[in-house]
Curated annotation (Swiss-Prot):
It comes from Schizosaccharomyces pombe (strain 972 / ATCC 24843) (Fission yeast). This is U3 small nucleolar ribonucleoprotein protein mpp10. PANTHER family: U3 SMALL NUCLEOLAR RIBONUCLEOPROTEIN PROTEIN MPP10. Residues 544-554 have a biased composition (Basic and acidic residues). Its main location: nucleus. Keywords: Nucleus, Phosphoprotein, Ribonucleoprotein, Ribosome biogenesis, rRNA processing. Component of the U3 small nucleolar ribonucleoprotein. Required for the early cleavages at sites A0, A1 and A2 during 18S ribosomal pre-RNA processing. Residues 235-248, 529-543 have a biased composition (Basic residues). Residues 76-151, 183-274, 284-303, 499-598 are annotated as: Disordered. Residues 512-522, 555-567, 581-598 have a biased composition (Polar residues). The modification Phosphoserine is found at S268, S269, S286, S293. GO terms for biological process: maturation of SSU-rRNA.
């Protein structure tokens, strides 16, 4: 074990899953034999879906309530009172003081650690079933007292011991190494023997052990199971003081030599505890407990300490309760009463601010009134009555037409031009509408007058004659195209197509346009030729279409021709009567010269 500690001490710094599993199973077995009080929040241990550490926390919490519920037991053994937790019942053995000191120190360490975990103590020892204890291997399993009685050590209740590791042997070897270090002066009894600012690499170079890991004498219980609580340390010190007081008041030793030896052992154990506390403070001390002066620190350490202090201040400010002004929108319930009276607020409002009525503004207004009265300056606005009431004229009302105008822009310009050119005779739409209304009024009035006359007379009153305007024109009825000079002949009035009519013989190479003018193909340009070809193709297409339609309607045409010969009349959709006529009997008018366009 010592070789393993010196070679690879870091193996004990990491938890072993198998050992932790055995520890939890053994603890559950012990928990099943203990009666848990009703005040405990945990009555059953839940293991499904939880790891060993969570199960261990449940067991520790349940054991705490179970230990508090047990009665106190007085132990007369002074070594049990001194060490606070032990498995010995009689310590009057006549073994050697050195062996007794080693065993007591070893038990002190084990029991103090178990008490810190919450699974040991005088109360818990009574509840643990003897069947749940395991045999401890090694020569340290049994110790003989003065009367030769064999006392069994505390059982391994947590399953830490296996074929390779034994917690008792480990504690003994650790204490032995610590004693050797104390004797050699490595660990002194005074605090001055430890230099807090020393370089730890210096001792590592001088050490015979060439391993890079931590030394065996520096490995503590806290390296495996975490630091002890302050309550556990205070309870341990209290029990130590009580044991010392009882030891001084109870002269139960056989001789002074034995008493001196035991006192020396107690002092050595106290010194060892003090040494352990100093080493623990050196390892786990915080920045607040560092008493090193600022002169002995380097510039980097001073900057680091200053930065740490700033971080602590900022963290404290962040965690502390903030004022209501720093908590966002605060209502009346979220701030103290009358807290707005001492605060200047800036807020936006949509209304016009009311002027503040101060003493200065009041005095200024009073002085202004007094000065006006003294100078008799009464420049108020004089009252005046309206001269005349404006006359309402409906004709001046403007009627806006919301509908879109139906007239074109040319008609608008035409109307505007007529209005400017003939201002006297021009009549707008409003004037025309007004005249129409006047005519309607006159017609209604004449009808009313005639009705009144017929009622007042004894005879029939005929309707008044209506005045009709007829325009008689004395001018000769001559059309413009018929007016010709008397000396001119009819030949001069003919159109070109009437003068020249190409016959079928001399029509080759000539084309008659729509206007009737003949043009030669040599005189035609490319566009005119394309237009002629399109016209010819269109003419042939229409002819073919007519022939196809004629063939389709040959039966219908025959029936219609038969009906037309018989002078049959047919009533149409509008109720009119018409004779049936075939397409062959339709009238084709003859085009004369008067119907041709120039």
């Amino acid at each position: 074990m010592t070789e393993l500690i010196n070679s690879e001490p870091t193996l004990f710094l990491f938890p072993n899953k198998e050992d932790s599993k055995q520890l939890v199973e053994k603890a559950i077995e012990v928990f099943s034999n203990i009666k848990i009080p009703s005040t405990s929040p945990i009555q059953t241990i839940v293991t499904k879906g939880l790891d060993n550490w969570q199960i261990y926390n449940q067991l520790a919490l349940a054991a705490k309530y179970a230990l508090d519920d047990l009665p106190q037991v007085d132990v007369e053994n002074e070594d049990e009172e001194e060490d606070s937790i032990t498995s010995f019942q009689d310590e009057d053995d006549e073994t050697s003081h050195q062996e007794l000191s080693d065993n007591s120190e070893m038990n002190n360490r084990d029991d103090a650690d178990d008490e810190f975990l919450g699974f040991s103590g005088p109360e818990n020892l009574e509840d643990v079933d003897e069947s749940s204890a395991e045999d401890v291997s090694g020569d340290e399993a049994e110790i003989m007292n003065e009367e030769g009685q064999q006392i069994e050590q505390k059982k391994d209740a947590f399953g830490l011991n296996d074929g390779f590791f034994d917690i008792d042997n480990f504690n003994k070897q650790t204490l032995a190494l610590e004693e050797e270090a104390v004797e050699e002066g490595v660990l002194g009894d005074e605090d001055d023997g430890i230099d807090l600012l020393m370089d730890p690499d210096e001792n590592m170079e001088d050490s015979e052990d060439e391993s890079n890991g931590p030394q065996a004498d520096s490995i503590m219980y806290e390296d495996f199971f975490g630091p002890k609580t302050a309550a556990g340390r205070r309870e341990l010190k209290k029990k130590k003081a009580e044991s010392k007081r009882k030891r001084t008041s109870k002269p139960d030793f056989k001789n002074d030599v034995q008493q001196n030896v035991i006192e020396e052992n107690n002092e050595s154990s106290d010194n060892e505890y003090a040494t352990f506390d100093r080493v623990k403070k050196d390892l786990f001390a915080s920045d607040e407990e560092d008493d090193v002066s600022a002169d002995q620190l380097s510039s980097y350490e001073r900057d680091k300490a200053r930065l740490t202090q700033q971080i602590r201040e900022l963290e404290a400010e962040n965690v502390a309760k903030k004022s209501w002004t720093m908590m966002g929108e605060a209502t009346s319930k979220g701030r103290p009463s009358n807290s707005l009276l001492d605060v200047d607020l800036e807020f936006e409002t949509g209304a016009k601010p009311v002027p503040v009525q101060t003493e200065e503004t009041t005095e200024t207004l009073e002085d202004l009134i007094k000065n006006r009265i003294i100078s008799k300056t009464f420049d108020d606005v004089p009252k005046r009555a309206p001269v005349a009431v404006t006359e309402f004229r409906p004709s001046e009302l403007f009627e806006l037409n919301e509908n879109k105008s139906q007239r074109s822009l040319a008609e608008e310009y035409e109307e505007e031009f007529l209005k400017k050119s003939n201002a006297d005779t021009y009549k707008s739409e409003a004037d025309k509408k007004k005249e129409k209304e006047h005519e309607e009024i006159k017609a209604l009035f004449s009808e009313v007058s005639r009705t009144l006359d017929s009622l007042a007379s004894w005879h029939y009153v005929p309707p008044p004659p209506e005045s009709t305007v007829e325009i008689v024109s004395n001018a000769p009825t001559l059309a413009m195209e018929d007016v010709q000079p008397t000396a001119a002949s009819d030949t001069m009035a003919l159109a070109p197509q009437e003068v020249y009519k190409p016959s079928n013989e001399n029509r080759e190479g000539e084309t008659i346009t729509r206007s009737g003018i003949a043009i030669s193909s040599t005189e035609m340009d490319h566009q005119q030729k394309q237009a002629r070809r399109r016209r010819v193709r269109r003419k042939h297409a229409e002819k073919r279409k007519q022939m196809a339609e004629k063939r389709r309607n040959s039966g219908t045409e025959q029936v219609v021709r038969q009906l037309s010969k018989s002078n049959v009349e047919v009533i149409g959709k509008g109720g009119e009567r018409k004779k049936v006529a075939s397409n062959s009997n339709k009238y084709h008018p003859i085009v004369s010269s008067n119907q041709l366009k120039l």
